[in-house]
Amino acid sequence: MTSGKPVILVVEDEAVVRLMAIIVAEESGFEALSAATADEAIKILESRSDIRLVFTDVNMPGSMNGLRLAHAVRGRWPPVELLVTSAVGNITAKDLPQRGRFLPKPYDVAKLSEAFQEMAGG
């Protein structure tokens, strides 16, 4: 059952950080789904057609990191917006898929909410 709100999928392996992003999404008026790995995120994307934005960390365990996930999402679900985050490494525009955006960690809650609104708002 969907809420009728725009849907954001938060992909983050650190539970506390994932929960914080979910809270920001929900307080910003979105329905939030979560995944701890890219593989879990792909399964959710395959089962839901209403996801507007994937917000993913780069460094995660599993078969692919967040950048590979972002490129996979762009290839399979072109309308889905992509917001990538990381505390390490120099992520540049050339690393991101088309229309992807980068938000460095640690991020300000207001900036995260603003990015969610700009990228997935109704």
Predicted regions and their residues:
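Two-component/phosphorelay signaling modules centered on CheY-like receiver
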Residues: A15-L33
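Short loop/helix-cap segments at secondary-structure boundaries that form the rim of catalytic
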Residues: I91-Q98
